[in-house]
Amino acid sequence: MKKVLASATILSLMLVGCSNGGNDESSHKDDSSKTEQKDKSSSQHDSKKDSKRNDTNNKQDNQENNTNKEQTNNQNPNDGEQRTSERPTTNSNGNSSDNQNKQQQSVQDNQNKYVAPYQSENATRVARCLSPFEGDRSQALQQLPNFETALSIAKNEANMYGSENKSYNDYSIEQTEDGFRYVFSFKDPSKSNTYSIVTLNRQGQPTVVDPNFQP
């Protein structure tokens, strides 16, 4: 009888052990499946985070590219304006330099061609009698056009009245309210003892005072 009870006790203990072992295995399986699900969820969550990060980075890159393009576009028009504005300036400076060089050359030519004022050979005192000048002749001449130029202009003006072949006779200087002026006399070959009187101011403007003057 004791043997039977002992065998029954051992059998029941074995059954209990098997039962516990089965429960442990099923519990371990449940834990494993839960862990796998957590790992999957975590990996999915991480992948979503990575995707969001990539999207954010792409947006930032696009924004930076757009900003750089805008800055480049904003700078280029300014460069164009500067280049455009520089060209006319260079041209105007070049033209100005050319004009200055021409003016200087003209002044040098006039100085090289300078001829001191003179009376014609065997001149009659006509202009000198009309306008005797007792002032500083050199100072007056500095304010007047070149003598040869003034004489040529005055002669052309005199030839517009009467004979066109008048000859130079004499000159004088006359003081005016605004400075000085030349006084020229030109002999008319077609009339006896007749002269044309022409004045020329500082600006080089001639005026026929008397086309038929007889001293």
UniProtKB/Swiss-Prot annotation:
GO cellular component assignments: plasma membrane
Residues anchoring lipid (N-palmitoyl cysteine): 18
PROSITE patterns tied to this protein: PROKAR_LIPOPROTEIN
Composition-biased stretches (Low complexity): 63-76, 91-110
Compartments in which it is found: Cell membrane
Positions of region (Disordered): 17-110
Cleavable signal peptide: 1-17
UniProt KW Lipoprotein keyword: yes
Bilayer topology: Lipid-anchor
The protein's name: Uncharacterized lipoprotein SERP1959
Record lineage: Bacteria, Bacillati, Bacillota, Bacilli, Bacillales
